[in-house]
């Protein structure tokens, strides 16, 4: 069944399935490592396998949010609209560092470059604000799913983009009104949105949006929502 479920994956996505994710408990304490494939198989998720992840919400200086549509070759939620960049820190020393979420923020820099072509001479660790954490569990299809504690990271900066079409079908900046209209279209069955993006928008982004010039009052690094 797994073999049949990966026929839409390209060489890049198949290679990434062998990357080592950080396995955690529900307090976000590291307890080991496992492959990205194993972490996203529903048979393992249903046994409790949980890993660390992150989502970046990237705003330009006009306070528009970069929304991407995931490539059709993605193993979970292909073709769905979602946040600016979401992925996983890897089980490597530089991405395991927990002080100030440095490891996760380094992983975000890596994936912003890989997915969106944002070179690291444009953006630094200091540009990435660790806002809070959110637990989520969702099923993509009979084989694949997500079971993560995601670090919510915020960037507000004008950046040059060069998306990798193997990762991103398309992306565009949206106003708060545009995002609400996207959610409304999804509710009518006209669009597909990842479950974590919908909950992120409704639980956090609409509250943060009017305060993007200074989000310090919303920073909750010790909190894990959704548990």
Curated annotation (Swiss-Prot):
- What EC numbers are recorded for this enzyme? 5.3.3.2
Q: Where is the Nudix hydrolase domain?
A: 49-199
One Pfam annotation reads NUDIX
Specify whether ATP-binding is a keyword of the entry. no
Record SUPFAM superfamilies: Nudix
Which cofactors does the annotated protein need, by name? Mg(2+)
Instruction: Report residues binding substrate.
Output: 36, 70, 74, 87
State the InterPro entries in the record: IsopentenylPP_isomerase_typ1 (IPR011876), NUDIX_hydrolase-like_dom_sf (IPR015797), NUDIX_hydrolase_dom (IPR000086)
Domain of life (superkingdom):
Eukaryota
Query: Which family does the entry's similarity section mention?
Result: Belongs to the IPP isomerase type 1 family.
Q: What is this protein called?
A: Isopentenyl-diphosphate delta-isomerase 2
The organism named in the record is Mus musculus (Mouse)
């Amino acid at each position: 069944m797994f073999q049949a479920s990966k026929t839409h994956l390209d060489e890049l996505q198949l290679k990434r399935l062998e990357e080592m994710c950080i396995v955690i408990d529900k307090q976000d304490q590291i307890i080991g490592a496992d492959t990205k494939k194993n972490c996203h198989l529903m048979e393992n998720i249903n046994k409790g396998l949980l890993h660390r992840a992150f989502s970046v919400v990237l705003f330009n200086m006009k306070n528009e949010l970069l929304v991407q549509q995931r490539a059709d070759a993605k193993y979970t939620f292909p073709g769905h609209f979602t946040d600016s960049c979401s992925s996983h820190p890897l089980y490597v020393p530089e991405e395991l560092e927990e002080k100030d979420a440095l490891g996760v923020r380094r992983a975000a820099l890596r994936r912003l470059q890989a997915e969106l072509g944002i070179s690291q001479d444009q953006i630094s660790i200091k540009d990435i604000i660790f806002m809070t954490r959110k637990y989520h569990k969702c099923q993509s299809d009979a084989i694949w799913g997500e079971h993560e504690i995601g670090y919510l990271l915020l960037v507000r900066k004008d950046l040059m983009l060069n998306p990798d079409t193997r990762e991103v079908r398309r992306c565009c900046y949206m106003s708060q009104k545009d995002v609400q209209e996207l959610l409304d279209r999804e509710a009518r069955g006209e669009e597909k949105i990842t479950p974590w993006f919908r909950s992120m928008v409704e639980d956090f982004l609409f509250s943060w949006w009017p305060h993007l010039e200074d989000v310090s009052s919303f920073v909750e690094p010790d909190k894990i929502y959704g548990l």
